[in-house]
Amino acid sequence: MTPTPFGLSYLPETPSQTAGPYVHIGLIPSQAGFEIFRNNFSGDIAGADVEGQRIVIEGRIFDGAGHVTKDVLVETWQANAAGRYNHPADRQDKLLDQRFRGWARTGTDFNTGIYTIRTIKPGSVAGRKGRKAMAPHVNFWLASRGINIGLATRMYFDDEEAANAQDPVLNIIEQSERRRTLIATKSERDGAVVYTFDIHLQGERETVFFDV
């Protein structure tokens, strides 16, 4: 390899940038009014043939001042109903439903600020290296203007209290009262099971985020 004629100290650092305000055009074109892909990304990943209980996950995302943010990109990644991810690295001896991709991408509504994911309820996931099984959960990743690095968090289910109490990730959160920021609330609406999961980016009610 030929050495550079000058040291790295002469290379200026690239300025950081946030994802917005045009994040939807590049990452969720259908939400910006551009139907340019055959299969546009969406938050509806529970096809008719997918095994599992149909659920709706919805919520709003608040900034540090308590205002609803309306331009956030939301991605989710989850196991199937048997607790297995559709990924080569997951080699559990559990049913792999190839019809369920487990990954969704959507955005908060420009008017209401509500994001919506239509999916199935995941099963418990085997723990790594002999650890206890992880309670059913959905992984979240957020990007928006004002956020330099995407934020990662998790959503757990309030009707899985026993499993949540044993979850190894929830239990590493030292301030036990903050674990509640990761618990979604169950309700029923028009015959559908709905879990409400609001996310707070900053402030006294800040959601727990993970360095992944």
Functional labels for PLM-detected ranges:
Residues 1-212:
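Beta-strand-dominated extracellular/periplasmic modules and repeats
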